[in-house]
Amino acid sequence: SWGIVADVNQGPAAIRDTAALIEADADIAALIAKDIKIGSQNLERLVSTADGIQMTGDTLSANHHASNVLFNIMRGGLFIDNYAIDKSDLTSFCAQWNQRVFEANTTFFDALPETLLYHDLDAALLDNTDLQLERLCREYLPLSFSRRHGDPSRPWNRFAIKVKDEKGKKLLNYEGNWRDIFQNWEALSSSVPCFGANMISKFVNATTADGYNPYRITRQGIDWERPEPENPWANIGYWGDHQLIYLLKLIEQSVAHNPAALESMMFRDAYAYANVPYRIKSYASILSDPYDTIEFDESLDRVIDKRVEEMGADGRLMPDPNGGVYQVNLAEKILVTLLSKIANFIPDTGIWMNTQRPEWNDANNALVGTGVSVVTLCYLHRFLNKVVPLFSALSQETVQLSEEEAEFLGEVRSVLASHQSSIGAGPVSDTIRKDVMEALGTAAERYRNRIYEQGCSAVKQTVKLANVIDCLARARDVSAVSIRSNRRSDGLYHAYNRIAVNTDGVQIKYLYEMLEGQVAVLSSELLEADESLSLLKTLRNSPLYTARQHSYLLYPNRQLPSFMARNLVPRTFVESSRLMTALLSSGNTDLVEQDQSGQVYFAGKFNNTASVAAALTRLASEGYAEDVAAER
């Protein structure tokens, strides 16, 4: 027998030792078999640690569960020693993030045993008064086995599983895209629930003051994409649906396992804001070009790099006026996440996708800009449905919020209250839809501009929790109305819509059915039991079900036009256009071209609407200004 073995990542000495072993009289086959057995046992132990080994009457389901858990921990990692914490690794983590805070708290670390449990660290923090230190320790997660995604379209993301350092010592590390990490931590938190509080800390400390998250997250900090004009894969922007459902699932787990811990987190200023150098444009600019909505602040990016050199990974967090890390409570972090979505709410339509990135749930990946998500609206409703009673049950009657955030909350509450009678009752007119969209959008713009231009003032304002709850309850109620407005005539629900904005209002353009819309509505906790059953039956009898696979499709298997059937400009349209008629008469092919049979097409050089807009601008300067102005 023979085998092919790849013993990779070996240095020159190790290579020669391996060669000597092969040339020796040792039973190589037996050594390899023994190593495979040890590796298999180690892998089984890892899967077991995350509750992946089950024994049930359904062997196929048990095996399926084991493979799911394996793939899960390969992305998000696992707590290889459960709740055990190595003090040396904890101190290394804290020093890497903020050397000054670490040095100021050497007494705290000296008092800790060399090996401790999560609960020991939690108890030690109760006697601590340094909230910066508490933030660092609350964010510590001793994870291992996490790998990068390995998607070739993301050059940074080379496949790797690192479990040992160069000296062969166990390596605690994790890294990945935001979705890869938090989607898998949701499941992991069921196995080690107390660390769920630290996962929440990691999540909210990596979100920005304007309510979004960077692209990449690692043990060493956060990272974001930068403009690369020469790289067709590169782009900046925020994915639209990360902020809600992943955080909500972690909060739900925390409430289920340790509600007292979550309440204590609500009022402690032990959380920070990521300082991503993206600047979302004004509402008017977004409305003018919803595909180009974010600017990259190169000077701020350089300042952040310098801060990282000086203080550690904390340099990527929003500073306070004194240059330290600005900290707020968990209640504020949750509110920022929710308000950023509510501010992009369009009645009867969904949540506007206007940050240059699609949603992961978007099966088309092409709706960003004019696309509006019912999917995210459903998850927003579920979040609001949970957070209203959560805030109502808090023991305090007031909460301290950043002055800027408190004013933003007040403006959003005012908009919802003034339009409650219309958007809270059912479908509204295009005019009212635009009025609400503009009022919310400009409120968010004022808040963002204040943060962008001045940073956080660090001035806190006392806000009645009753006012916070009132705002969130109003948002919950209108979200429920809009979700129901998206019920299709066939009993399914819209997943995504498009909008057309004009001077008179906002029109909704509905799309075909998609699976994600049904999943989101079922997850929203809006439907009654009989409504959910009806939807499931309708789904089974819809074009989304495929009997061949006994499963469901993301969207129906539609008959699409062939290549030769595309880009055909109808004769009636050409004849109604003075501009096209004039261009064809003069032989100008900047906008349209014609074949020998008389069929008209848009110029083949166009790859998007921006190309068409540029051509129209050129034509306006070449003697066609009147016609361009009339038809543009």
What residue spans do the PLM features occupy?
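Acidic, mature catalytic/reactive cores of soluble proteins
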Residues: S1-R632
